[in-house]
Amino acid sequence: IPDPTTAGDFCRRFTVPDIEALMNVFNETRLRVWQQQPASFFELAIVEADGTVVPTTGECKEGMDINHKGQWGYHALVLSLANTGEPLYVVNRSGNRPSHEDAARWIDKAIALCRRAGFRRIVLRGDTDFSQTKHLDGWDTDGVTFIYGMDQKPNLVDIANALPEGAWDRVKRPAKYAVKTSPRRRPENVKEQIVVRRKFKNTRLCSEMVAEFDYQPT
């Protein structure tokens, strides 16, 4: 194990092209490993995009910045194969950069990698930060499915409110866990008692409803 200062000096020698070349080497090896999987493995690839905050307490870290929560550090873009949890691409960015910045280029790289591997279907997944409307048509034309969140914009709220009551279905979520022994008595909820005693407004989820409608962003 090298001395920390030696390891840091070695890592700082890597430029962006060096790191991209290293990720490409990993992925070339990954392709060969995947070929050992059964045919069912290649039925579907779920490519997940996420912006991950990497905080630091250092003061001399090159490229760090402060984010909207007041944290110093970096905001890495992580593209992973959700089926296995493998990180396909990790892109370091300054801490104040938005999640979607340069994401489409790396998503396209992940799609190309999965195509080379032989996946028959590809699904992109992520939160609202990755639903970049200028790229959706291209992915759809390319036969790629995507599941992205959409911001609660007024026009979408109006469409949802105008749907007939019969268009909505209750969301059924599986239990978080199964009790393998006898159920135990729940302890007293101290927080709930304080909320009631002080007459705070207590908003609780009663149910979730879902509906589908066609929508094409402009």
Model-predicted segments: where are they?
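Short, conserved catalytic/metal-binding motifs centered on acidic residues
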Residues: 1-3, 7, 43-53, 85, ...
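Short, positively charged, Gly/Tyr-enriched micro-motifs
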Residues: 1-29, 81-88, 107, 115, ...
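Active-site-proximal, Lys/Arg-enriched surface segment
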Residues: 4-78
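Short acidic/polar capping segments at secondary-structure boundaries
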Residues: 51-54, 61, 84, 94-96, ...
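Short acidic, glycine/serine/threonine-rich loops at helix termini
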Residues: 56-62, 88-92, 102, 133-139, ...
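Electropositive, glycine- and tryptophan-enriched low-complexity nucleic-acid-binding patches
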Residues: 67-117
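Domain-level cores of phosphate- or acyl-group-handling catalytic modules
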Residues: 99-155
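An anionic, glycine-rich sequence signature occurring as long contiguous blocks
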Residues: 145-218
